[in-house]
Amino acid sequence: IGSGLVGSEMCIRDRIRSGDGRTNKYDVEAGNNTYDNAVIENSKISGKNKIQNNQSMLDDIMNSTQYPKQLKDLALKNEEALEFVYDYPAEHVKEHTIDLTEEASMDSVPLFVQWDKRWGYEKYSGNFFAASGCGPTTLSMVVVYLTHNREASPIAVAKYSKEAGYSVDGSGSSWTLISEGCRHYGVKAKTVALDESRMKAELDEGHPIVVNVGPGDFTDTGHFMVITGYDDEGFSINDPNSIEKSGKRWLFRNISSQIRAVWSMYV
């Protein structure tokens, strides 16, 4: 593993950011102001339409009796989960197939989100999994990466968490789901000091790092996430509650005060 990467997550994300990974000729040809202006204008229109569409969906959710209060709260708190909530009436009654074959064969830590329709409508810890399932989702990402176990989906880990007593009603998951529950899946965890150099050393060994964070950039309460690598711009994080935040880099000095616990995960 080179350049502080667990697998090749950084490269994958760079390709995602640039679309299909190819360079458009307009990206390298200078002086095409007409094209550039058109792109900017279309971007503005697209952004405006998205805002209007999101507001329309939110209004429909809030004015309907088809949505449980917990999902309405989620829609208000997390714009990324808005479409997931909006689709609840039609989707929550379906049986969703979960096939993690592709993710289990990846050479990078897969990103799973709590509000995936395949598992987000299930209940966990007194709430919808979409709102309370960061612990099982985080452990699932680590287990699937380290062991290639395609059966260890977020909702499968949630079921185990409940049976083993790691689910805390109204509060999500206990920290021991990570530090002890991982053994159920053949994964080990060791506590690591909140030190940038030490954490980078673990990542260099190919060990993804699970952190629990308090109020700040990622949560108002408590939250589990996976640190997957680092580069000159900062740490890369798989946030099970945000695809957008998972696509950014995070400087240690900006997140260290929010981190409450650190575990290095390995087999």
What are these regions (language model features)?
Residues 105-160:
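Active-site nucleophile-adjacent alpha helix/oxyanion-hole segment immediately C-terminal to the catalytic cysteine
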Residues 17-53, 59-62, 99-100, 144, ...:
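Conserved active-site-adjacent core of cysteine acyl-enzyme catalytic domains
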Residues 1-7, 12-14:
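Single conserved hydrophobic/aromatic residue that forms the stacking wall/gate
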Residues 42-111:
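Non-catalytic propeptide/linker segments at domain boundaries
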Residues 2-5, 131, 168, 227:
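Short glycine/serine/threonine-biased micro-segments
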